[in-house]
Amino acid sequence: MALYTEEIADFIWRNGQIIPWAEATIHVNAVGHASVAGIFEGIKAYWNEEQEELYVFRLEEHLERFLNSIRMVRYGFDYTRQDLHEAVLELLKANEYRRDVYIRPYIFQKGLVRELLQAQPGKATELIIDSWPFSSYRDMNQALQVCVSSWTRISDNVMPPRLKCFSNYHNGRLAAMDAVVAGYDWPVMLDDRGKVTEGPGACLLLVRKGRVIAPPVTSAILESVTRETIFTLLEEVLQIPFEQREVDRTELYVADEIFFVGTGWEIMPVASVDKLPVGGGKTGPITLRIAEAYRKVVTGQDRRHPEWRTPVWEPGR
């Protein structure tokens, strides 16, 4: 997945101002964006060469999720969703992007590391919006070899997965490290009852007998914007039936197709689980159809749901 590149942006947005990327610094003893309390969001914008337009995909939904996470941790925060909307567009224009871009707003409390254990609702925050180019090319024939992790997925009453916070991702990182050391590409995580949840940073869907199946949002998963997009495409564009229900571990072993979905991952097929081939051991036909439909809608080739795409370079904006 070519999500992180060596390229950096010229500018970053910080607390209401566009500043040079190199000047966006904090002291080493500050809490920092990767602290326990840091909240973030992942958004993508796609360049359409034919239309000469950069589309931010489902910006409003991502900002709503960002604001919901901020609400849950009781941060002091004065920006509205419209303020954030305008800030994202301002940053993209400042960097003069005419290519695919990953956008990451994040927020953390001001202060020193030793203040982390002090409950301070409403404490002042730092708000940053970063961005960087990425390649959206994906070889759909390169499917993942995955395993079921021995690490249990965090739960809503422990560290709620609905909250998009940096610290939650350490749970998935532990599982991912174990998987890679064992020779796999990526793990699938189970909840404390042994039910399938998701992978680190991406939701999981499977296909059985022509029907797409997804664990419900109460299955220790992030409420995924990409997943909701896929559900709409399945119903309106592809006419493929789907359902949300609990998924057993052994269903992964008998699935016809399995794939991960997420803003960063987009659509990523799975070739095997615990060394057992999924379907024929290669990307399945329904996965390919979903990936094609998704690609068309995010780039504006499919003009349905224009409310999903916020144009950056549209005259008058």
Feature locations, PLM:
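Helix-start/capping segments and mature chain N-termini
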Residues: 1-79, 86-90, 117-317
